C-alpha cells in the first residue's frame, strides 16, 4: 500500500473531519518570544466551532508553568483549558518512584519547578538511582563534550529525558535541548526513557 501525503493550505481544510486536535506550542503557536497571530486565529476558530484541542509542549516543566509562560506572552486564557507538557508526563511517573527514588538533576535552575517537592531526593551522580535530564546546566556549558566527560562513568544508570527535542529556536537563536544530551548518552551505551513528542506517553496522558 502506497501512502500519499496530502498537502493542505490550512487546518480549516480538514477540521470538519476531526473532533479533537493535538497542537504543538513551540514553533507552531509561538517562537519562544512572541505568539504567531495566524496560529491564534486558528485557535479562535477551533474554539468557536467547539472543537476540543490540547496544546502540547516538550517543555521539561509542569503544565502550570507553561500556562503562566503563555499568559505572559499575552495568550487568552480561554485557550489554556488543556495544556500538557513532557515535564508533566515525566512528573506523573516520577511520583510513583518507577525508576527509583534518588536522582541526579542534569539541567538548568529554571527547570527546578519540575522537582518541587522532590528536592530531598536530589543527589550526586555517585549516589543516584537515575539521571533526570531537563537540559544543559547553564548557558556557559554549551559544549556536548563537557557532558560526555561528565557522564562517561555513569552509563549504567538510566536517564529520564523530559524533552526529546534536539535543538530549539528561540527567536533567531538555536539552543541544545535535553534530547541532544540523551542522544549522546545513548551513543555512549546508556539507556534513556523519553517523555514527550513523538513518544506515546505524552499522548496517552492527554487522552
What are these regions (language model features)?
Residues 2-207:
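HAD-like aspartate-dependent phosphatase fold
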Amino acid at each position: 500500500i502506497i501512502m500519499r501525503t496530502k498537502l493542505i493550505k490550512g487546518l480549516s481544510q480538514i477540521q470538519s473531519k476531526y473532533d479533537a486536535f493535538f497542537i504543538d506550542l513551540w514553533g507552531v503557536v509561538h517562537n519562544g518570544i512572541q505568539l504567531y497571530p495566524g496560529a491564534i486565529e486558528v485557535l479562535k476558530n477551533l474554539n468557536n466551532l467547539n472543537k476540543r484541542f490540547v496544546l502540547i509542549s516538550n517543555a521539561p516543566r509542569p503544565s502550570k508553568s507553561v500556562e503562566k509562560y503563555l499568559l505572559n506572552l499575552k495568550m487568552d486564557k480561554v485557550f489554556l483549558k488543556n495544556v500538557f507538557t513532557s515535564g508533566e508526563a515525566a512528573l506523573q511517573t516520577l511520583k510513583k518512584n518507577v525508576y527509583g527514588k534518588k536522582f541526579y538533576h542534569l539541567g538548568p535552575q529554571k527547570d527546578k519547578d519540575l522537582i518541587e517537592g522532590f528536592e530531598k531526593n536530589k543527589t550526586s551522580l555517585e549516589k543516584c538511582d537515575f539521571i533526570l535530564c531537563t537540559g544543559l546546566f547553564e548557558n556557559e556549558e554549551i559544549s556536548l563534550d563537557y557532558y560526555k566527560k561528565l557522564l562517561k562513568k555513569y552509563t549504567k544508570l538510566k536517564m529520564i529525558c523530559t524533552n526529546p527535542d534536539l535543538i530549539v529556536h528561540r527567536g533567531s537563536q538555536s539552543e541544545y535541548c535535553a534530547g541532544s544530551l540523551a542522544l549522546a548518552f545513548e551513543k555512549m551505551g546508556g539507556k534513556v526513557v523519553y517523555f514527550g513528542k513523538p513518544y506515546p506517553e505524552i499522548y496517552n496522558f492527554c487522552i
